[in-house]
């Protein structure tokens, strides 16, 4: 992708990880994060060995968050700490695209990626091109994605609101603190 790798690196990194996640889901759904070492019975009790391959992205991202090393995805690359530059920001971007894909449905992310690549072959593209392209494909509001997920390091912290107990089910509201 022909874009400014100092400021918009997260787009190409996110596309790369997102595509890897989709590939693994489709062609290797049984693969584990630790690979064939997961087959050894002596290691079965360790949670890390039992994680699916794509769960490693969440694992490493959460490792960064728990150590309070999270940085916004739109932070210039030269301002990132080494762990974020090499690992966690890429995973966060890929997970964010995967989350957005689930939210938008209708194959919007894969289609937008193809169009973004085509656009980048003609000119240098930027975040605004990517944002405009995504917003043109849906009627859903995407400001939350760019303002909260990309531009800030605000953590998503859900809290249960009102809980209604019925005969055979529970109804509840969730809100982000």
Sequence positions of predicted segments:
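Hydrophobic alpha-helical and helix-loop surface patches within well-folded domains
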Residues: 1-176
């Amino acid at each position: 992708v022909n874009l400014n790798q100092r400021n918009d690196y997260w787009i190409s990194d996110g596309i790369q990880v997102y595509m890897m996640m989709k590939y693994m889901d489709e062609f290797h759904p049984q693969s584990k994060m630790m690979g064939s070492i997961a087959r050894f019975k002596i290691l079965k009790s360790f949670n890390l060995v039992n994680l699916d391959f794509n769960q490693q992205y969440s694992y490493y991202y959460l490792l960064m968050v728990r150590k309070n090393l999270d940085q916004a995805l739109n932070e210039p690359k030269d301002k990132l700490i080494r762990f974020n530059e090499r690992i966690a920001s890429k995973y966060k971007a890929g997970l964010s695209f995967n989350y957005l894909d689930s939210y938008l449905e209708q194959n919007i992310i894969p289609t937008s990626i193809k169009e973004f690549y085509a656009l980048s072959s003609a000119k240098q593209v930027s975040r605004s091109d990517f944002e405009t392209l995504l917003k043109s494909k849906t009627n859903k509001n995407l400001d939350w994605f760019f303002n909260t997920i990309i531009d800030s390091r605000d953590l998503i912290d859900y809290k249960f609101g009102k809980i209604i107990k019925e005969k055979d089910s529970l109804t509840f509201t969730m809100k982000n603190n």
